[in-house]
Amino acid sequence: MVTMKDLLECGVHFGHQTRRWNPKMKKYIFGVRKNIYIIDLQKTLRYFRNTYTIVMDAAAEGKTVLFVGTKKQARASVRDAAIACGMPYVDNRWLGGMLTNFPTIQKSIRKLDVISEMQENGQIDLLTKKEALMLSRQKEKLESYFGGIRNMKKLPDMLFVMDAVKEHIAVLEARCLGIPVVAPLDTNCDPDLITYPIPGNDDAIRSIQLFCREMTEAINEGKALRSGGRDEIVAEDSEEVSTVDADAITAEDFETEEV
């Protein structure tokens, strides 16, 4: 489970410049340093651990978590994290209606499956070169948009979003459908839109990797619980929590980042 050292080393405490912020994030801000907001990592740690448990429990119940992250520095981390825990993902572009108009999205996925099947059984070779090329290009485009959700047969039970501002359409669609959203909250975000917020940097690659890695671990632990390893994992969690108490962390932990 994540520690204060992990958060500091990955730069999770660095927010945006003071001219770019959402006043609703004030309660999560520790101070200012060189016109950069410093996020209160004591709160980050508590929210992180609470959310970790929530995601783990969701996975233990067999729920599906959709990973969303389409900005350049997040794509690979989001995709790899989702694959590592067997969850669907969107890493290219969020198309409006991916949740609220899911039946139409399913039609596009079925079209992708049909073209793939034609390539596998050789039916595509019966077409003209022009027709085969058009289908191949269509498949490539469909795969870039829907490859990560190809096996998602129903709406997800939860979203993990990297950069809630950029992925605001995904967040709004989830809220519209009552789907809970987990997301790191940088200092320019609106915390009211996120069900399970974790105050932290959502731009730095190391910070993104940390968030993704922890979500993957939470989901895999939940799946292990579901398959029967509950007692062993609960014992490990209890030992870890007793080692580092989030409430016991003081301002001294921020000495290297004084404002």
Curated annotation (Swiss-Prot):
Keywords: Ribonucleoprotein, Ribosomal protein. One of its GO terms (cellular component) is cytosolic small ribosomal subunit. One of its GO terms (biological process) is translation. CDD domains: RPS2. InterPro entries: Ribosomal_uS2 (IPR001865), Ribosomal_uS2_bac/mit/plastid (IPR005706), Ribosomal_uS2_CS (IPR018130), Ribosomal_uS2_flav_dom_sf (IPR023591). One of its GO terms (molecular function) is structural constituent of ribosome. This is Small ribosomal subunit protein uS2. It comes from Sulfurimonas denitrificans (strain ATCC 33889 / DSM 1251) (Thiomicrospira denitrificans (strain ATCC 33889 / DSM 1251)).
